């Protein structure tokens, strides 16, 4: 007979097996390594950024291993009858059917008109599973199945194009404390310590004959290093330097974790040979041209110069700006002599100073440190203050020069030290024989006290305005005993422009039995 009309659509089938995992996305090459920035303070955590746009579709990689079959989903709700599909291609001829029973031969009737389409019948009971049929033609795509489990990681794909530079990461956690360093050499002899408190005056002893001045004793052993002071407060952030030249590309980073399965993409011709991007083939090292060697050497030299600026060593070739900078860069170092360059110019005018890391001071020694013993001045005229640097012995001024640095260069460095400091201090020791330095025990006043001249021509006196008054730590020059004594004078100020001392003017001198000499202590800035 003639083929019947196409029947209504059947019920929706059960969910298909899970699809194969999508190809792995390409790993972007690491960004170009930037120059190290200046060390700033730890910032507050930023707000979470907005979700970025999805990246471009990666090149299709080889299919991953087939995942295990997912669990059978529950039957879906019956869908509405779909529209009649297009006529399918004729199927292949089936096997001949079995012979039926012979029917009664009827008379040939006339072809009848096509009847109306009947209503959809009720779904029949599910039949038993039939034998596996032959492979039919490819049907229309079915509905998307449920997402299967993540498949095993596929092989590493070829290197993708260079990615955009990522945001700066947050500073890492503080590393563990390093191992203690080896014991260093014995340090140089330290500066003279502060004198002790003035003791109670003893009973006057019998005046003995003045003995000859003994020879200088041997230098004692170096004292033990003091305890490290507390770390200083973090200084203000420095000015941002000019942008340096672009550094060389860093080495490839480690492979990232497998990405989520990508969407199935259509075929696309990229216009290049796939063998060029195979990651499992070793790359031959690039050949460097002569100019590449010159560029590489220049970049290494610039990197070394940047490292010396960030971490000064306190040497003549790599001086620090102040002792405080050296202390911040190397908190484990102990006090001693180091090279600094306060004006940050050419290192040829760097100066050698004593860095006291326990107090954070930068100390510069006077040259010379002492004025030798002598009957400096003889006069029978009226008593008055006489300046050592102007009148006595043709002028003997206090200098603060360092070997290899001119007086003009030293003056420039001292000017920068005053600008960088908030506090300054210095002491001077007046050795006397029958000369009053501070208080006259006979009269009980300070009329015979010495006067000191500061670096900005200010005169520092024993009494008066407290801003210009020095302090006496030890006063052993209060009366005439025909023996040597000493008076230690100290001046501290929050105006560094007033130091160092440039001159001293004693008053009680000029007699035949009067002698004195001076030890100028280091000036310390903080």
Curated annotation (Swiss-Prot):
<comment type="function">
    <text>Type I collagen is a member of group I collagen (fibrillar forming collagen).</text>
</comment>
<comment type="subunit">
    <text>Trimers of one alpha 2(I) and two alpha 1(I) chains. Interacts (via C-terminus) with TMEM131 (via PapD-L domain); the interaction is direct and is involved in assembly and TRAPPIII ER-to-Golgi transport complex-dependent secretion of collagen.</text>
</comment>
<dbReference type="Pfam" id="PF01410">
    <property type="entry name" value="COLFI"/>
</dbReference>
<dbReference type="Pfam" id="PF01391">
    <property type="entry name" value="Collagen"/>
</dbReference>
<dbReference type="InterPro" id="IPR000885">
    <property type="entry name" value="Fib_collagen_C"/>
</dbReference>
<feature type="compositionally biased region" description="Low complexity">
    <location>
        <begin position="44"/>
        <end position="81"/>
    </location>
</feature>
<feature type="region of interest" description="Disordered">
    <location>
        <begin position="1"/>
        <end position="291"/>
    </location>
</feature>
<feature type="binding site">
    <location>
        <position position="341"/>
    </location>
    <ligand>
        <name>Ca(2+)</name>
    </ligand>
</feature>
<feature type="binding site">
    <location>
        <position position="344"/>
    </location>
    <ligand>
        <name>Ca(2+)</name>
    </ligand>
</feature>
<feature type="compositionally biased region" description="Basic and acidic residues">
    <location>
        <begin position="165"/>
        <end position="176"/>
    </location>
</feature>
<keyword id="KW-1015">Disulfide bond</keyword>
<keyword id="KW-0677">Repeat</keyword>
<feature type="disulfide bond">
    <location>
        <begin position="363"/>
        <end position="524"/>
    </location>
</feature>
<feature type="compositionally biased region" description="Low complexity">
    <location>
        <begin position="110"/>
        <end position="131"/>
    </location>
</feature>
<feature type="propeptide" description="C-terminal propeptide">
    <location>
        <begin position="263"/>
        <end position="526"/>
    </location>
</feature>
<keyword id="KW-0964">Secreted</keyword>
<keyword id="KW-0106">Calcium</keyword>
<dbReference type="GO" id="GO:0005576">
    <property type="term" value="C:extracellular region"/>
</dbReference>
<feature type="domain" description="Fibrillar collagen NC1">
    <location>
        <begin position="293"/>
        <end position="526"/>
    </location>
</feature>
<comment type="similarity">
    <text>Belongs to the fibrillar collagen family.</text>
</comment>
<dbReference type="GO" id="GO:0005201">
    <property type="term" value="F:extracellular matrix structural constituent"/>
</dbReference>
<feature type="compositionally biased region" description="Low complexity">
    <location>
        <begin position="9"/>
        <end position="36"/>
    </location>
</feature>
<feature type="binding site">
    <location>
        <position position="349"/>
    </location>
    <ligand>
        <name>Ca(2+)</name>
    </ligand>
</feature>
<protein>
    <recommendedName>
        <fullName>Collagen alpha-2(I) chain</fullName>
    </recommendedName>
</protein>
<feature type="disulfide bond">
    <location>
        <begin position="323"/>
        <end position="355"/>
    </location>
</feature>
<feature type="compositionally biased region" description="Pro residues">
    <location>
        <begin position="249"/>
        <end position="261"/>
    </location>
</feature>
<feature type="binding site">
    <location>
        <position position="346"/>
    </location>
    <ligand>
        <name>Ca(2+)</name>
    </ligand>
</feature>
<dbReference type="GO" id="GO:0005581">
    <property type="term" value="C:collagen trimer"/>
</dbReference>
<feature type="binding site">
    <location>
        <position position="343"/>
    </location>
    <ligand>
        <name>Ca(2+)</name>
    </ligand>
</feature>
<keyword id="KW-0379">Hydroxylation</keyword>
<keyword id="KW-0176">Collagen</keyword>
<keyword id="KW-0479">Metal-binding</keyword>
<feature type="disulfide bond">
    <location>
        <begin position="432"/>
        <end position="477"/>
    </location>
</feature>
<dbReference type="InterPro" id="IPR008160">
    <property type="entry name" value="Collagen"/>
</dbReference>
<dbReference type="GO" id="GO:0046872">
    <property type="term" value="F:metal ion binding"/>
</dbReference>
<keyword id="KW-0272">Extracellular matrix</keyword>
């Amino acid at each position: 007979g003639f083929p019947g009309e196409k029947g209504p659509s059947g019920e929706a089938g059960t969910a298909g097996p899970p699809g194969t995992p999508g190809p792995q996305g390409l790993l972007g090459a690491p960004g170009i390594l930037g120059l190290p920035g200046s060390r700033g303070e730890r910032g507050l955590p930023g707000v979470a950024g907005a979700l970025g746009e999805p990246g471009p579709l990666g090149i299709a990689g080889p299919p991953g291993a087939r995942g295990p079959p997912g669990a059978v989903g529950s039957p879906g709700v019956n869908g509405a009858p779909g529209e009649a599909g297009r006529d399918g291609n004729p199927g292949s001829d089936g096997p001949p059917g079995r012979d039926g029973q012979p029917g009664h031969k009827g008379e040939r009737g006339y072809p009848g008109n096509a009847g109306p389409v009947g209503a959809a019948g009720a779904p029949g009971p599910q039949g038993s599973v039939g034998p596996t049929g032959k492979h039919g033609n490819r049907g229309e795509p079915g509905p998307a199945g449920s997402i299967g489990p993540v498949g095993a990681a596929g092989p590493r794909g070829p290197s993708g194009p260079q990615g955009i530079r990522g945001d700066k990461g947050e500073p890492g956690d503080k590393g563990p404390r390093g191992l203690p360093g080896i014991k260093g050499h014995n340090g140089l002899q330290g500066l003279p310590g502060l004198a002790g408190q003035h003791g109670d005056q003893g009973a006057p002893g019998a005046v003995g004959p003045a003995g000859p001045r003994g020879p200088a004793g041997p230098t004692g052993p170096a004292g033990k290093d003091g305890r490290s002071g507390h770390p200083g407060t973090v200084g203000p952030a420095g000015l941002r330097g000019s942008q340096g030249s672009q550094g060389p590309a860093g080495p490839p980073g480690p492979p990232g974790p497998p990405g989520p399965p990508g969407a199935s993409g259509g075929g696309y011709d990229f216009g290049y040979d796939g063998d060029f991007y195979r990651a499992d083939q070793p790359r031959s090292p690039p050949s460097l041209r002569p100019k590449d060697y010159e560029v590489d050497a220049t970049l290494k030299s610039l990197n070394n110069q940047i490292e010396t600026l960030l971490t000064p060593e306190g040497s003549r070739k790599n001086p620090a700006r102040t002792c405080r900078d050296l202390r911040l860069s190397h908190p484990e170092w102990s006090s001693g002599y180091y090279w600094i360059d306060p004006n940050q110019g050419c290192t040829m005018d760097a100066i050698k100073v004593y860095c006291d890391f326990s107090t954070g001071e930068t100390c510069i020694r006077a040259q010379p440190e002492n004025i030798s013993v002598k009957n400096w001045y003889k006069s029978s005229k009226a008593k008055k203050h006489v300046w050592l640097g102007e009148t006595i012995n043709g002028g003997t001024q206090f200098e603060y020069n360092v070997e290899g640095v001119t007086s003009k260069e030293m003056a420039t460095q001292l000017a920068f030290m005053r600008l960088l400091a908030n506090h300054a201090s210095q002491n001077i020791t007046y050795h006397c024989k029958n000369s009053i330095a501070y208080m006259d025990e006979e009269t009980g006043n300070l009329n015979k006290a010495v006067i000191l001249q500061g670096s900005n021509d200010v005169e520092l006196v024993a009494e008066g305005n407290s801003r210009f008054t020095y302090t006496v730590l030890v006063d052993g020059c209060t009366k005439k005993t025909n023996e040597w004594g000493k008076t230690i004078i100290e001046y501290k100020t929050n105006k560094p422009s007033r130091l160092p001392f440039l001159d001293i003017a004693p008053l009680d001198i000029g007699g035949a039995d009067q002698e004195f000499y001076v030890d100028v202590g280091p000036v310390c800035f903080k």
